[in-house]
């Protein structure tokens, strides 16, 4: 059964995912570090799992828990590269789907930007997340959900 796992420490689309899955029967797990603890109550199909505040602790837990039927939402290219051949779909919060063709290019860009920073240089970061970005993500996730439901 399909399940959505969210890399929840910095995900701007958690509420959208919850809203879109409320009627679908798809369970959602938000994985966060304790430094991002929240008392927010979620619907019954949503669970929150907290892990220690170590570097990449959330990523390790996601890799451990994910299965071939899962959809993982993350903006972490490193985590996405570990999951792209393991899970059903890995998706960025901008709606783009990571795959074996685009992940290496994204990792290379991340590496080049790290080298620029290491040498004291600067590079342009991502633009602010907008309502339009949220709508694009929602449309992309809905397409994925409909495709999965058709296969079930």
Curated annotation (Swiss-Prot):
Pfam families named among the record's database cross-references: DUF188
Domain of life according to the entry: Bacteria
Family: Belongs to the UPF0178 family.
Name of this protein: UPF0178 protein SAB0630c
